[in-house]
């Protein structure tokens, strides 16, 4: 009996806070509904306007005075050493974090003005900690989409990443399970194959913007090169950001953004930067030497 009385008192005491919380949630919903609907646009132009960003409880800015325009259909490599601000730039572009100062614009409008769900429909993203699930191959690619043209879209996506021949050779094709949790005859994919499957999942969405954030970080140089050779196919007709600390990918891109300590150190093509930017050329040569040494050890 005492417990019931105590519970009743607690409910009365905390009821006002519950009511305030419900009002807050409702207020957030109304605010979200008041935001702009993002109409389908043929060209998406992103602008970083004097953007600064500092993570909570940190003294240094992760991004400092970033001014950058990303035009529709551009293939960009964003490079720099660990901690240079590459992933922070992506999170700002996705609207997952808000600038401490400055604005990120889409076609001249602050992205915070758009409904977040509408805004994110423009992006397909592959992060370095991607997940492959022990479901069927097709379910890993289409995220359980059962639309009538799903199978054709799956085959197109896996062909673009160079997995079509491998998957077609399996007895059950795209209906093959990955791993043995649900099917003893499930297939095991190598690191490179799993990486390609994650990229195929992003391509299946067929969005206007594809972001690949360190997608080859865990792969050896040979497997990495195989993925790079598919870059033109992957990025065809799309705005593509390739975030990496490995500079071998940059020659496949229209432009290279070099970040250093959260700021743009240089901007240009791979060949321009090799000739004209000491920091970039030194990074490139150090990595080239590292890869050459690795190849010699394998031999």
Residue ranges and their predicted role:
Residues 173, 229, 246, 251-299:
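C-terminal portion of ABC ATPase nucleotide-binding domains
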Residues 105, 164-197, 206-208, 290-299:
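ABC-fold ATPase nucleotide-binding domain signature/coupling loops
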Residues 1-25:
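Cytosolic ends of transmembrane helices, especially the final helix of ABC transmembrane type-1 domains
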Residues 25-77, 156, 233-236:
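Primarily ABC-family ATPase nucleotide-binding module
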Residues 210-214:
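Catalytic Walker B motif of ABC-type/P-loop ATPase nucleotide-binding domains
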Residues 103-105, 120, 138-184, 228-229, ...:
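ABC ATPase nucleotide-binding domain helical subdomain, centered on the C-loop/LSGGQ "ABC signature"
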Residues 94:
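Helix-to-loop junction immediately C-terminal to a conserved catalytic motif
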């Amino acid at each position: 009996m005492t417990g019931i009385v105590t519970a009743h008192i607690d409910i009365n005491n905390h009821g006002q806070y519950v009511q305030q919380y419900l009002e807050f949630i409702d207020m957030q919903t109304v605010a979200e509904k008041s935001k702009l609907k993002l109409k389908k646009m043929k060209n998406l132009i992103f602008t970083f306007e004097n953007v600064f960003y500092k993570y909570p409880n940190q003294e240094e800015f992760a991004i400092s005075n970033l001014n950058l325009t990303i035009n529709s259909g551009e293939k960009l490599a964003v490079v720099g050493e660990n901690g240079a601000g590459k992933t922070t730039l992506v999170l700002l572009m996705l609207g997952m974090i808000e600038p401490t100062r400055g604005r990120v614009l889409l076609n001249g409008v602050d992205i915070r003005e758009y409904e977040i769900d509408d805004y994110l429909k423009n992006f397909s993203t592959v992060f370095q900690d991607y997940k492959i699930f022990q479901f069927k191959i097709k379910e890993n690619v289409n995220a359980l989409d059962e639309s009538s043209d799903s199978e054709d879209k799956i085959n197109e996506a896996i062909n673009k990443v160079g997995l079509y021949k491998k998957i077609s050779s399996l007895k059950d094709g795209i209906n093959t399970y990955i791993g043995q949790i649900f099917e003893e005859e499930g297939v095991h994919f190598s690191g490179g194959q799993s990486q390609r499957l994650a990229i195929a999942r992003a391509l299946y969405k067929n969005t206007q913007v594809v972001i690949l954030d360190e997608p080859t970080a865990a792969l050896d140089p040979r497997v990495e090169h195989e993925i790079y050779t598919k870059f033109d196919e992957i990025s065809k007709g799309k705005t593509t950001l390739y975030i990496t600390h490995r500079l071998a990918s940059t020659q496949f891109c229209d432009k290279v953004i070099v970040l250093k300590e959260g700021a743009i150190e240089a901007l240009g093509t791979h060949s321009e930067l090799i000739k004209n930017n000491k920091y970039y050329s030194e990074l490139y040569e150090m990595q080239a030497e590292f890869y050459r040494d690795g190849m010699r050890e394998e031999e």
